[in-house]
C-alpha cells in the first residue's frame, strides 16, 4: 500500500471526523477537533468484469435486488467523500451529510451502561437472553414518558435495536403483496425495503419513481403536507414527522386528516417519530395524540438522535391492541411473532442506558444535547438566509432543507464538496420531490458548523 493510500485510509472515519486544512481556507489547528485514530481497509464487494469467475452456485439472485438503484444513499455519499479525499488528501473535510450524532453521550446515561456491563461480570448480575419484546421496566418507562394519557400500555411497546431495523421487520411482517405510500421526499429506507420485499414495480428513470408506490408530494407550496385528495388508496402509509429530510412537522389538523384518510381507506400508518423531541411548537409529538389513531396506526422511534445512540442502538415500536388486520387478527401478535423469530432482544447494556435516559436527570441531559444541535440549525439557517436562499426545516428537526432552484441536487452536492470540502446530502436522494434541494445536517461540533458556514459564505457570497 502506498504512503498516500495509507494516509487516506486512516482519514476516512466517522461523519464527525475532521482533517488537515488546505492552505486557501486559512484554518487554525484548533478546528481539527478529533484525532485520526480509526483505520478503514478497502474491501472488494463486487466482482469486476476483469476478474475471472472460478465458480458460481446454482442459486438465483433475488430479482428484487436488481431493481435497487445504485447504492443506498448514505454509503454512496461516503464513497464520493472517499474519492474526494483521494483527490485532496490534505483537505479538512467537514461532514454535514449523514445524520450521525457527534456530541458525547451524557455521563448519567453512560454510567448506567457501565454499571450494567460490570454487573455482567458477576454471578449475581449476569443475565443472558432477555425478553424479545424488551425489559418490562423499560417498556413501562417508554409508555409513561412518551405516551402517558394516550391509552398506550406497557405491552404495546416493543423495544428494539433501532427504528431502521424495525422498519425492515415490519416490511417482513407485511409481506410482498401490500401497496405502500411514502412522503416525497422521505427517508430512503421506506422505499428501498419495499423494493427488496417485492412490493414495487420497476424503476422508471423518466420520472425517477418505482411502479406501485404512491408518492405523496410534499413541497413548500403545500407546507410539506401532501394533498390527500390526490393520493390513491394503499395498504401502508409511511409518514415521518418531524420529517427527514425537510424538517417539517405536521400540525394537529393535518394529522387528523391523515388518520381520517387512513380510516376511510382501511390503511395502516407507519408513523416515524424519530425526531419528536426536537419539536419547538405544540404540534403533536405522537400520532396517538390524534383520536382514533390507535385503530389505524403504529409508531416507531429511537434514542439515536436524542441520546447519541446511533452506535449504541436502541429504539422501539408501538402497536396498539386495537390495530387489526382485515380479518380481525391483531397486528401486534404478528409483530411479536416476527421479533421472536428474527430477533433475540435488544442488548441489556443498551436497555440499561435507555432506562437512564428516561430518568429526570437523563431527560434533562438529552434536552441539553438536543438544544445544542438546535443552536447549530439556527447558525445554518442564518447563513443560507443571509445568502438569499429559501430555507426550510430546522425549527423542529436537526436538518435544514435548502432550495437551489433550477439546479440538480447532485450537482450542488458536488460543487459544495469540490469547492468547500463540506459534505451535504443531495435532496433527490430522498425521492424525486427532493430535486433542487440539499439537506444540511446540524449534527456536528460547533467549531465545524461555524467553519462550514464560513465556507458556504465564501462560495455563495
UniProtKB/Swiss-Prot annotation:
Tissue occurrence: Highly expressed in seedlings, roots, stems, flowers and leaves. Lower expression in siliques.
Binding of pyridoxal 5'-phosphate, residues: 129, 163-164, 187, 244, 275, 302-304, 313, 344
Keyword Transport: no
Thermal behaviour (record text): Optimum temperature is 36 degrees Celsius.
InterPro entries (alphabetical): Aminotransferase_I/II_large (IPR004839), DapL/ALD1 (IPR019942), PyrdxlP-dep_Trfase (IPR015424), PyrdxlP-dep_Trfase_major (IPR015421), PyrdxlP-dep_Trfase_small (IPR015422)
Effect of mutating residue 398 to S: In agd2-1; reduced activity and increased resistance to pathogen
Any one Pfam family match given in the protein's UniProt record, by short name: Aminotran_1_2
Keywords noted in UniProt: Aminotransferase, Chloroplast, Plastid, Pyridoxal phosphate, Transferase, Transit peptide
Keyword Transcription regulation: no
Pathway info: Amino-acid biosynthesis; L-lysine biosynthesis via DAP pathway; LL-2,6-diaminopimelate from (S)-tetrahydrodipicolinate (aminotransferase route): step 1/1
Catalytic activity, reaction form: (2S,6S)-2,6-diaminopimelate + 2-oxoglutarate = (S)-2,3,4,5-tetrahydrodipicolinate + L-glutamate + H2O + H(+)
Induction of the gene: Not induced by pathogen infection, but down-regulated by dark treatment.
Residues holding substrate: 72, 99, 164, 187, 244, 344, 439
Annotated SUPFAM superfamilies: PLP-dependent transferases (SSF53383)
FT transit peptide: 1-45
Main location: plastid
Enzyme class: transferase
Family: Belongs to the class-I pyridoxal-phosphate-dependent aminotransferase family. LL-diaminopimelate aminotransferase subfamily.
Function in brief: Required for lysine biosynthesis. Catalyzes the direct conversion of tetrahydrodipicolinate to LL-diaminopimelate, a reaction that requires three enzymes in E.coli. Not active with meso-diaminopimelate, lysine or ornithine as substrates.
Note: The expected covalent binding of pyridoxal phosphate by Lys-305 has not been observed in the 3D-structure.
Assembly: Homodimer.
Protein name, entry field: LL-diaminopimelate aminotransferase, chloroplastic
Organism expressing this protein natively: Arabidopsis thaliana (Mouse-ear cress)
Source lineage: Eukaryota, Viridiplantae, Streptophyta, Embryophyta, Tracheophyta
Amino acid at each position: 500500500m502506498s504512503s498516500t493510500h495509507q494516509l487516506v485510509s486512516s482519514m476516512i472515519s466517522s461523519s464527525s471526523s475532521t482533517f488537515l486544512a488546505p492552505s486557501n481556507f486559512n484554518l487554525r489547528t484548533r478546528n481539527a477537533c478529533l484525532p485520526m485514530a480509526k483505520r478503514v481497509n478497502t474491501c472488494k464487494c463486487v466482482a469486476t468484469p476483469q476478474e475471472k469467475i472460478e465458480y458460481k452456485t446454482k442459486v438465483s439472485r433475488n430479482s428484487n435486488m436488481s431493481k435497487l438503484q445504485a447504492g443506498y444513499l448514505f454509503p454512496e455519499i461516503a464513497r464520493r467523500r472517499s474519492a474526494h479525499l483521494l483527490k485532496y488528501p490534505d483537505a479538512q473535510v467537514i461532514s454535514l451529510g449523514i445524520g450521525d450524532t457527534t456530541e458525547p453521550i451524557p455521563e448519567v446515561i453512560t454510567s448506567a451502561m457501565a454499571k450494567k456491563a460490570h454487573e455482567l461480570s458477576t454471578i449475581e448480575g449476569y443475565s443472558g437472553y432477555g425478553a424479545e419484546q424488551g425489559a418490562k421496566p423499560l417498556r413501562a418507562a417508554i409508555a409513561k414518558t412518551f405516551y402517558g394519557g394516550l391509552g398506550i400500555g406497557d405491552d404495546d411497546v416493543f423495544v428494539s435495536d433501532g427504528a431502521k431495523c424495525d422498519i425492515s421487520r415490519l416490511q417482513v411482517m407485511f409481506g410482498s403483496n401490500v401497496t405502500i405510500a411514502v412522503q416525497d421526499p422521505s427517508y430512503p429506507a421506506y422505499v428501498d425495503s419495499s423494493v427488496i420485499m417485492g412490493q414495487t414495480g420497476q424503476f422508471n428513470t423518466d420520472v425517477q419513481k418505482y411502479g406501485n408506490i404512491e408518492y405523496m408530494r410534499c413541497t413548500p407550496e403545500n407546507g410539506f403536507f401532501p394533498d390527500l385528495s390526490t393520493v390513491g388508496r394503499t395498504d401502508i402509509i409511511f409518514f415521518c414527522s418531524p420529517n427527514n429530510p425537510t424538517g417539517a412537522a405536521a400540525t394537529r389538523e393535518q394529522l387528523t386528516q391523515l388518520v381520517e384518510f387512513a380510516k376511510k381507506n382501511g390503511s395502516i400508518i407507519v408513523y416515524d417519530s424519530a425526531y419528536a423531541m426536537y419539536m419547538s411548537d405544540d404540534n403533536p409529538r405522537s400520532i396517538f395524540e390524534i383520536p382514533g389513531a390507535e385503530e389505524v396506526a403504529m409508531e416507531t422511534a429511537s434514542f439515536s438522535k436524542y441520546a447519541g445512540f446511533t452506535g449504541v442502538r436502541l429504539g422501539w415500536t408501538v402497536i396498539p391492541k386495537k390495530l387489526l388486520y382485515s380479518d380481525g387478527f391483531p397486528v401486534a401478535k404478528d409483530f411479536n411473532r416476527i421479533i421472536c423469530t428474527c430477533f433475540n432482544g435488544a442488548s441489556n447494556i443498551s436497555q440499561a442506558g435507555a432506562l437512564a435516559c428516561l430518568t429526570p436527570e437523563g431527560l434533562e441531559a438529552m434536552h441539553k444535547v438536543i438544544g445544542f444541535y438546535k443552536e447549530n440549525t439556527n447558525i445554518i439557517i442564518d447563513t443560507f438566509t443571509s445568502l438569499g436562499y429559501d430555507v426550510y426545516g430546522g425549527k423542529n428537526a436537526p436538518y435544514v432543507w435548502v432550495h437551489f432552484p433550477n439546479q440538480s441536487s447532485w450537482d450542488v452536492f458536488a460543487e459544495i464538496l469540490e469547492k468547500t470540502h463540506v459534505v451535504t446530502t443531495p435532496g433527490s436522494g430522498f425521492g424525486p420531490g427532493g430535486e433542487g434541494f440539499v439537506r444540511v445536517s446540524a449534527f456536528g461540533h460547533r467549531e465545524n458548523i461555524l467553519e462550514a458556514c464560513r465556507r458556504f459564505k465564501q462560495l455563495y457570497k
